[in-house]
Design a protein with these regions (language model features):
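Canonical Radical SAM [4Fe-4S] cluster-binding loop centered on the CxxxCxxC motif
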Residues: 106-142
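Cysteine-cluster motifs in flexible loop/terminal segments that predominantly coordinate metals
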Residues: 373-422
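N-terminal [4Fe-4S]-dependent radical SAM core
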Residues: 8-14, 19-31, 71-114
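Short amphipathic alpha-helical interface segments
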Residues: 25-67
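Radical SAM/AdoMet-radical enzyme domain recognition
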Residues: 113-114, 130, 142-163, 170-283
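Local cysteine-cluster metal-coordination motifs and their immediate loop/turn environment
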Residues: 120-131, 336-339, 376-394
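C-terminal accessory region of radical SAM enzymes
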Residues: 243-246, 286-314, 339-383, 389, ...
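Short Fe-S-cluster ligation motifs
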Residues: 151-168, 367, 405-430
């Protein structure tokens, strides 16, 4: 008997007793004991050839006595997990299904929209991905935003993220959210936090989650990349949420070379002092000149992830732009995502009567829906391709002018992150 399998199959240590076995070509994985891991190594070494007497003798060198029925049971378990296959037909079918599953589905519906009610901001963050956009744009009225969002809700969009600019620069933000919020609609606010304290009592009942940007509890360190404006308000905000609703707030830090050495200590301090989760995000360069600012964010270790229940699962990743995500600027122009609100990526205007057809048939939409990691040079043969997805197309475009360009400067980090997600997958499901 000969088993078929992906030659790049990965064995990743999970803990002292177990391992994660991952099959890259079909993105299937399972947790395995030491005994099963030994069998996998044997199968790989023998190129899939199964001779039961040889396997029995192989195990004896580890002082393990196994019967043929036990070995068959192990193999059946690996086959049921779709890590190994008894015949070529099953292997080919699995490969075809995987490739079809990764492609964009025409029935995919938009379910998340980034709302930019304004691009005005009272900060001037050095790494802002929207800093090149003019804050002098016209802005839709209160009633226009309410009507637009209610139309999107009727299309089954159920997640609205208010961002900017600083969304709280709009004095009517509370009015807009109050009008569109219901039990089936999730609302999130991305804010620098400086203006939030004065309005948090009104927003807390109608907003599901808040993300506030902060790099340090030290005003001088925080001001290196951000601003000192409203710093005390942000600290008061942490204390408020710590007491009232710690699970509704996340603190987001952008990792750069200026803060890479202190960010983990900052994360720990926020979590221990306020009971609030921290989210570290990579710096997104706006051009090649900013590549020098990139630092590799720390990968949360397993103990930290267990303690704070961070979700680092092993989902198959692909960019959601134009498939389940859209972004709308202050004038109502629609874009694939919040990081690519550039003239060349404008899809339509939300006020147009036929905007849905325009978006669906746009050449920009087709470009994003045709992005496949299996077609990317340097990625298509990588064992981690379905876990990392090849990286962010917005970064690739801003740095290289090509949505499909390989992000060599992020590759090592993305591999480490992928391996960690593999190790964490079963912890999360416990």
């Amino acid at each position: 008997m000969k088993l078929l399998y992906d030659k790049k199959i990965i064995i990743e240590k999970y803990d002292d007793e177990n391992y994660i076995i991952y099959s890259p070509f079909n993105h299937k994985f399972t947790k395995a004991s030491k005994s099963v891991k030994k069998l996998v190594l044997y199968i790989l070494n023998e190129n899939g050839e199964i001779e039961f007497e040889n396997i029995i003798n192989y195990y004896k060198q580890f002082d393990i006595e196994l019967k043929i029925d036990e070995i068959k049971k192990y193999i059946d378990t690996l086959v049921k997990a779709k890590l190994f296959f008894y015949n070529q037909e099953d292997y080919d079918t699995e490969k075809r299904i995987t490739l079809e599953d990764y492609r964009f589905s025409p029935t995919q519906e938009i379910d998340m929209v980034y709302i930019h009610p304004t691009l005005r901001c009272n900060f001037n963050c050095s790494y802002c991905y929207n800093k090149s956009l003019a804050a002098t744009q016209k802005e839709l009225t209160t009633n226009q935003w309410i009507q637009i969002i209610n139309k999107l809700k009727a299309m089954n969009v159920n997640y609205f993220i208010f961002t900017g600019g600083e969304p709280l620069m709009r004095k009517d933000l509370i009015d807009i959210i109050r009008e569109i919020k219901d039990d089936n609609t999730k609302v999130e606010i991305l804010s620098n936090g400086s203006l939030l304290m004065d309005k948090v009592d009104q927003l807390l009942p109608i907003v599901d989650s808040f993300v506030v940007s902060l790099d340090s509890l030290d005003i001088k360190k925080n001001s290196i990349n951000r601003s000192a404006v409203g710093f005390n308000n942000i600290i008061n905000l942490l204390e408020y949420f710590s007491e009232k609703a710690p699970k509704k707030l996340r603190v987001r830090s952008v990792i750069t070379k200026e803060n890479i050495d202190t960010i983990q200590a900052f994360n720990n301090e926020i979590q221990e002092k306020y009971g609030i989760k921290c989210v570290n995000v990579r710096f997104i360069p706006n051009n090649k000149d900013e590549l020098s600012l990139i630092a590799e964010p720390p990968i949360p270790d397993i103990d930290d992830t267990k303690k704070y229940k961070l979700d680092l699962g092993i989902r198959k990743y692909r960019c959601g732009a134009c498939s389940n995500i859209l972004a709308i600027n202050p004038e109502g122009d629609i874009y694939p995502c919040q990081s690519l609100m550039l003239p060349e990526f404008k899809l339509a205007n939300i006020l147009d009567d036929n905007w849905q057809d325009t978006v669906a048939n746009s050449e920009v939409t087709k470009k994003f829906r045709n992005i496949k990691v299996d077609d990317m040079e340097n990625c298509k043969d990588c064992a981690y391709r379905y876990i990392c997805g090849g990286g962010c197309p917005a970064i690739a475009y801003k740095v290289y002018g090509d949505l499909n360009h390989h992000l060599s400067f992020f590759c090592d980090y993305l591999e480490k992150e992928s391996r960690q997600r593999m190790r964490m997958a079963k912890i999360i499901s416990k």
